[in-house]
Amino acid sequence: MTPDTPAKTSAQNSECSGSCDSCSSAQKTPRPKGLPPKVKVNINHVILVLSGKGGVGKSTVAVNLATAFANRGKKTGLLDLDIHGPSIPKMLGIEKERPAVLAKCIQPVMVTPNLAVMSMAFLLPDTSTPVVWRGPMKMGAIQQFLAEVNWGALDYLVVDLPPGTGDEVLSIAQLAPNVRGAVIVTTPQDVAVLDATKAIAFIKKMDLPVIGVVENMSGMVCPHCHEVLDLFGKGGGKKAAEKFAVPYLGAIPLDPAMVASGDAGKPFINADPESPTAKAVETVMENVLAAIEQDSRPSA
């Protein structure tokens, strides 16, 4: 009721049916609409790395992709949003590090001057502690990882997501600014490709670009002759990309040395930069950069 609106008489009040929703005289309070506001952070490009299923080497791709960006002098952040199974700190040899808290701001762990990392693993008392959270708590944590971590000015934030298309993917897509799209990781097998196509469809439904598809474990590098052997088949990732008319970013062979490097906490592209696997990762990174730069160009 405004100051110019006369108050209702007792006779009018006595006619109230008790149904405010259908009453023309009831004051309507507008309900909030739309998605939650974007977190205000100084990040030029947010890149999501996800897969339809687990065990395809998604985190390995994310670590080496972020490292490749940092090696090129790009200010890069790596955000581990696999809240229930964080593995990024182990793969970078920083699992014993703990982020400092200064002036109500969390400092990410610096791997190199160009690579900053934040993970749920840093906040757990030990590696065997489970995270038993539902959706709202995970969304709150993701918001904190974006808004309360002192990322500084970043060229790229690479986000390693859990397998599938659950709360974490929805939350980061809603909260993060400048999401340039998603890199979908799969292996050549039909089962993995089937789930990868679901991830592609999900990203498109979120109205986000699919930067492209990476086929990981595409053949295997022989530890003796270093030739790439067709062990698990090839071409599944390329077929998935063609089916949905999205870019194919390249294939990365399975390399036992790459597995050992991850267990030792060293990104493989730094440990053995001349190997076929490291060169394949560099090719994928160059294709990701090209896709983002093309998307960022102003239209004629």
Q: Would you name each region that the model predicts?
A:
Residues 2-37:
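Cysteine-cluster motifs in flexible loop/terminal segments that predominantly coordinate metals
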Residues 38-44:
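Phosphate-binding P-loop
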Residues 45-83, 200:
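Walker A/P-loop phosphate-binding motif and the immediately C-terminal alpha-helix
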Residues 76, 81-128, 139:
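Phosphate-binding loop that captures ATP/GTP phosphates
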Residues 118, 142, 161, 174, ...:
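Glycine-rich phosphate-binding loops of nucleotide-dependent enzymes
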Residues 124-172:
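Phosphate-binding/switch loop-helix module in NTP-utilizing enzymes
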Residues 155-261:
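Conserved catalytic-core segment of NTP-binding enzymes
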